[in-house]
């Protein structure tokens, strides 16, 4: 019977506290713009993405800028999130567009009235997954909607409902 050298046998057995699989050693996504003293331009967000994702990001951005009384600014959310494009309607925050790793994400907070007014069943599976993974409280629900694939259309639908409820108040 042949056995492997002792060095190889020891390498196959993990030590206490050592991670055993590549998925267990997965690193968190890289922050696109982490430094507070280096604010990016609005165009540099889409420039960091592959062409197809950059177009979706720009489409969401242009949709938001076409809405009446909506303004865009670049806002620093902290070292874990970095810089993002923040959109405000009048004085109230509307949403934010940011890069999470190498993916564009739209973040929207919905009040209870906006969440009740939204037709959740009309959203794609990406929008429904965003609802399933939403965080916050029933009075203020936070949705992280990936802008890849059909998520961009879901993001626009959610923002339209939020704008409609903001206009009523």
Name what the model sees in each region.
Residues 2-65, 71, 76-80:
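Charge-rich, low-complexity N-terminal segments
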Residues 44, 59, 122-125, 154:
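Exposed alpha-helical structural elements
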Residues 75-140:
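Short, conserved beta-strand/beta-arch hydrophobic-aromatic motifs that form part
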Residues 128-169:
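Well-ordered alpha/beta subsegment
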Residues 62, 66, 161-164:
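A generic structural signal for well-ordered alpha-helical segments enriched in polar/charged residues
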